[in-house]
Amino acid sequence: MEVRVAGVRKEFARFPALHNVSLTIQSGELIALLGPSGSGKTTLLRLIAGLETPTEGMIFFGDEDASQKSVQERNVGFVFQHYALFRHMTVADNIGFGLKVRPGGTRPSTAEIRRRALELLDLVQLSGLEKRYPAQLSGGQRQRVALARAMAIEPRVLLLDEPFGALDAQVRKELRRWLREIHDKTGHTTVFVTHDQDEALELADRVVVMSQGRIEQVGTPDEVYDKPNSPFVYGFIGESSTLPVRVENGEVWLADRNIGLGAENMPDGDAQLYFRPHDVELLDGCGGCIAGTVIASRRSGGKRRVELEVGGARERIEIEIPAEHPAAEKSRIAFRPRYWTLFRAGDSELPAPKAAATT
């Protein structure tokens, strides 16, 4: 089922939670709505579900305008962060609940509801637990039951609101792999909300990065990580280091130093340089590079994280270097980013012409 959000605006007591949001979700896609608190991601999910109605704009399920239709009319499955299972019902009864409460003409028989519940328990790898109650399950098992319940009604769209947020890190990691496998088996159009970038990048076919009620970027995990189109996306997805620089005649300057990066297609003026701390090339010395004084160094797994003062001690950045590097305090380190992006100073939406990787 294709879902299309067209020019949607949502206000709560005149507070704009979404600003003119448009998005097309292809049939069978697994989409992540990713952003910090207050970005509008949960509001967008609730609008797709029918739990909220848009102030302006329309929401289509296929060619059908679903903007004013209820959750039941849209036939969506919804999975909440805290499971929302009925404590007094067995696992099988929880899964079959959505089918049991259907109107008489569309309600399956008791035997069919049980068959469907057992079938889904097998799919979510919980066979044999149908007679247990939610209190007798682990958090990960409860979330699997919640997903099975959402799928029992054979929804046109499956929606998940931070489904793993209440679980510990190891369980979340296991359930991410499991959810991707379930999606590939069933082919549901699936939208999930998360603030966890690792979760979004690992699970989704495409990631919708949101900030302050707007969509900043939509792309594959590789696209939003490798080609972020705004300072916000660069800073939010993965780790980043940034320096205020100046562009003059196609060259990039930090304070009074030409740092050896070309910006031929960018107009002269102030800019912001972004790069990943691990994507740097260490240099023995250079006439055009970034050089700094070590003010802190710490071991982090197989690497070493180093904090440097650069630009005449006016700026501080972090880079990641091999663990065996001594990086003594007050020593000098020279480096150049391998991959980097320039944004015009003060530009929060669109990138300046982007430089290629250095060599």
UniProtKB/Swiss-Prot annotation:
Enzyme class, top EC level, equals: translocase
Which organism's genome codes for this protein? Brucella melitensis biotype 1 (strain ATCC 23456 / CCUG 17765 / NCTC 10094 / 16M)
Per its database record, what is this protein's job? Part of the ABC transporter complex CysAWTP involved in sulfate/thiosulfate import. Responsible for energy coupling to the transport system.
Q: Which reaction does it catalyse?
A: sulfate(out) + ATP + H2O = sulfate(in) + ADP + phosphate + H(+); thiosulfate(out) + ATP + H2O = thiosulfate(in) + ADP + phosphate + H(+)
Q: Name one Pfam family in it.
A: ABC_tran
Which residues take part in binding ATP? Answer: 35-42
Listed name of the protein = Sulfate/thiosulfate import ATP-binding protein CysA
Instruction: Enumerate the GO terms in the molecular function aspect.
Output: ABC-type sulfate transporter activity; ABC-type thiosulfate transporter activity; ATP binding; ATP hydrolysis activity
